[in-house]
Amino acid sequence: MRTELNNNATLLLKDGNVAHVNNIIGSGGQGFVYSVTVDGEEYALKWYKQNPGNVFYENLQKNAEDGAPSSSFLWPKAVTKVRYGSFGYIMPLKPEGYYEFSQYRLAKVRFSSFRAILNAAIDLCEAFRLLHAKGLSFQDLNDGGFFIHPDTGHLLICDCDNVFPHGESSGVLGKARYIAPEIVLGKNMPNSYSDRFSMTVILFMLFCIDHPFEGMNVVRYPCMTEEIERRLFGEQLCFMYDDADTRNRPVRGIHSNAITMWNLLPDVLKDSFKQEFAKAKLDAPETRMTEMQWIDVFTGIRDSLVKCPLCGDESFFRRTGVVCINRNCRGTSTAEMWMETESRSIPLFNNNILRMGKSDAVTGRVALKPGGNNILLVQNLTTHDWRVITPSNKSVTVAPRGFFPVKEGMKVEITDNKSTITYTITK
């Protein structure tokens, strides 16, 4: 069977189009990746070294026909007809400005802000929420499976060919160290629950760079064998910050990223990781946090992320106020008013920018009323009218670019094209 394709080769696609091979741009364990041209547009083509079989082929074809669950997936667009004993599929090319996650881990690329990391985490969770809502599971999420823009945090997921319906197997168990313990131990095949474990591992690595289970326990074994790997990542899996088991703590000089970043994380995020990686949760896949629960955590943290009024560095605002994390500044500030829902708290202070959705789009800004008296105003920076209900139950419409003065007890209804969220002004 022929494994590599020649430049200028032509391949027939199942949708009737023709792919013209330009040149090879990468390779991996399963196959080769080529630049191809289809109907004047450039795509990436993954060509399998070994034919994965009819079941895989038919599933890939169905996924291509159904379309991507979200624009965050570099999803199969069309499958080739079988040629040279194998086949492949075309997908969108990675846009300029996006980098593999491994480059962030090696510090070759850095996020421009903590907000960008939060945006990447939300993008990942939202993509998997939509994937699972379609009854599909990814089955092979690992650190080599996506690209991220360092400034916006926008995330793109590749290697989508192992996506199968929940409960059905693609024949691929996943990459070692990212596989859920029940898969390592042979208790289950990959499914949406194991996806959630792999996703949480990636989330931890987004924030702490290091792997959540590679502490002292792994350092003890400079030569990893299959037996040791099964024990450390299956039978005796232990989170490096487990409250009850300290044997796998990060090692100074080796896990410097984890030690530094863990201390900077808000308590709600640290508690979420501890909860998800606790032994009781590891043994009960169906109890793992859903993607929406993670999104609520991250949007809440993003609401509290503010710029220090003195130096401009990012810091987390709490009810007790904020202390700048810049050691050369240590400026302090407080908020007298907040916009709140049951799950979100947004501090209101002069010059704060309000972002109130998963998309991180700017919704409004806070300003001081000219003339003194320290009266705070909120400006509507959306394209929709807001409805403000005063403490005396009077309804006021705030048009785009308009302002309203902040008073305790007010309710603010903010509507976009899909939903309305009601905030209450509190002290």
Located regions from the model:
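Conserved C-lobe activation region of Hanks-type protein kinase-like domains
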Residues: 203-270
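Catalytic-loop of the protein kinase fold
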Residues: 128, 132-150
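Activation segment/activation loop of eukaryotic-type protein kinase catalytic domains
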Residues: 142-181
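Conserved structural core of kinase catalytic domains
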Residues: 74-120
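ATP-binding glycine-rich phosphate-binding loop
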Residues: 2-40
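C-terminal boundary/linker segments immediately following FHA domains
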Residues: 389-427
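Conserved catalytic-loop aspartate of Hanks-type protein kinases
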Residues: 195
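The N-lobe alphaC helix and its flanking beta3-alphaC-beta4 segment of protein kinase-like domains
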Residues: 48-72
